[in-house]
């Protein structure tokens, strides 16, 4: 086992604070509308230019073991805030640095670290209650657009794209962000349910120009096994042929003989049909087929449910107003399923999301939820260079997460104003002793740090601005983008309550733990062994 170095009390805390300051100073330059960019070196390819706090934090690894411990702990604040709220990482880092700096001064002065932490925890709980009281719901498109704009570094086009996407697919719909192929940002909306399986044969295509199959008001058969014998399908095919309508078959697979028969009948015009493979794999495939059955009003034909394909008839088929199939995707629009059954299915998926253990499972369940509840929107980010594309995509991702957080828990005045207004909730709050009171006072002062940093990044005098904001009430604050004061909500400067709350809670939690640290243990870096002497080159025969 490698030898360890142990640092105690003030020496340990000083090293830890140095690491925190290194990370926080790199992250906090990005805060606010006039925050600067940070350039990140990559082991391959061009450097990345970003204004995203968590991206900067994730890149930082310090040479000194003990300083690095401090930096990694605060990195956790940024990552946790990003995971929970999707934004507010820089605010959380600035709060943690401010709390820790003042907290360690108090510990050095002889105060009890545990009582300081209890005071901070007590004040945090009161501030969270006050933030919730200050919060206003965010449901109208204008507020959604404003939140998206602020989170995307005051880019109004991004705010509008997100508001449009939410208007089209609903607030719980799936919105994804992709790299576009042009210079302009685009919004693509896929209505209805789409899954990533196309037709099993190009001979099913009805439109030869763009190789798509368009089925109007088709019947839909959903089977979870391979179809190998065409005889099993004969009762269905005869019924569909008599009705004069089309048929979409969704099955695990259709084997060559049965597929050839379907293609021939389709080309001769006996029955208009298209077969596609079922989406997903294993248990997820069955769940997705049940979703499609619910959406279209079909009966899910599965031997697990004691149903055989040869026993099916026209009553087991679902319908939709339109189906479009390409070589890669199938889109079912306006399925004829009962609204009650769809709502019940949606509630089951929501319950599964709440119980999901892994991010992957949760993501797949959310995709299923969106497909059942209204569609998928894709924001395609446009840019001139690849570096700009990556930077912009990060900003759009942040803005999307922040907007979702705003819809979930509401909004408060932005620009650090909500935390300043929440200060009044601490007026009558006292701890059990002087050290706890000092912990409360620490947090009261620390929550001014985000506003101070926004002003500092804009080139202003932070103390003057903070005093001016404190002297007024309500949503009155400082707009760093154009150096003016006014109502932050009217100016469209909003923060999601969830983002501000998460930043505060995570910063207070980590700062409390670091203040109460008394020892640090790290491996001693061993000197690398000296390189061996290189062997001499042997003489070559025939050389003079």
Curated annotation (Swiss-Prot):
It comes from the Bacteria. GO terms for biological process: protein refolding. The keyword Isomerase applies. It is found in: Cytoplasm. The keyword Isomerase applies. It is an enzyme of class 5 (isomerase). InterPro entries: Chaperonin_Cpn60_CS (IPR018370), Cpn60/GroEL (IPR001844), Cpn60/GroEL/TCP-1 (IPR002423), GroEL-like_apical_dom_sf (IPR027409), GROEL-like_equatorial_sf (IPR027413), TCP-1-like_intermed_sf (IPR027410). Forms a cylinder of 14 subunits composed of two heptameric rings stacked back-to-back. Interacts with the co-chaperonin GroES. Belongs to the chaperonin (HSP60) family. This is Chaperonin GroEL. It comes from Francisella tularensis subsp. holarctica (strain LVS).
